[in-house]
Design a protein with these regions (language model features):
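Ordered, small/hydrophobic-rich secondary-structure cores
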Residues: 1-16, 82
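Short amphipathic alpha-helices in soluble, non-transmembrane regions
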Residues: 2, 33-42
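General beta-strand structural signal in soluble alpha/beta enzymes
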Residues: 8-9, 45-47
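Short, intrinsically disordered low-complexity segments
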Residues: 17-22
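Helix N-cap motif at beta-to-alpha junctions
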Residues: 25-31
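Active-site- and interface-proximal helix/loop "cap" or "latch" segments in soluble metabolic
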Residues: 30, 69-144
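A broad structural signal for short, well-ordered beta-strand segments within beta-sheet-rich domains
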Residues: 41-44, 87
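Structured beta-strand/loop patches that form or line metal/cofactor-binding pockets in enzymes
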Residues: 47-83
Length: 144
């Protein structure tokens, strides 16, 4: 969002309506955000304030399994070998381009695997790209 501070997050479980993403914005900017989205014909479900204990979730989460690391972004998960950087598994989502991306990336080192955003066209591929970028950064930093 041009000129509007925002952050891509996962909506809290009680606000999810499927395979959702959310933009965290300052609620004061709600009218400007609505105008901008409307002028670009971007459809959105709602703009809601978080209520008290409702917490927006980080889109990317990392789990270290010792020899491997799993990076979860949204509903997509990418697991890679910490030493070699080889993609061990891709799972999650339900979008039609994920089986193709899985076949293209599996068993390849992260730095030689294709970027999901260059080959996919769905929300799942966007989230897989987030997981890929984070995985590459973790691997280049020695698995941390």
């Amino acid at each position: 969002a041009e000129g509007i501070e925002n952050r891509l997050v996962a909506p809290p479980p009680e606000l999810r309506r499927g395979c959702d993403l959310a933009l965290e914005i300052n609620l004061v900017e709600k009218p400007a955000v609505e105008r901008m989205l409307g002028s670009r014909q971007v459809h959105f479900i709602d703009i809601l304030p978080t209520r008290g204990g409702t917490e927006l979730l980080q889109v990317v989460q990392v789990t270290d399994f010792g020899e491997a690391v799993m990076v979860k972004a949204g509903n997509m998960k990418l697991t890679f070998d910490k030493v070699s950087g080889v993609v061990l598994n891709i799972s999650g989502g339900g979008c039609p381009d994920i089986p193709y991306l899985h076949a293209e990336m599996l068993a390849k080192p992260l730095d030689r695997a294709p970027r999901p955003r260059e080959m996919g066209h769905t929300l799942c591929s966007l989230m897989l790209d987030r997981a890929y970028v984070q995985s590459l950064e973790i691997w280049k930093n020695g698995g941390r």
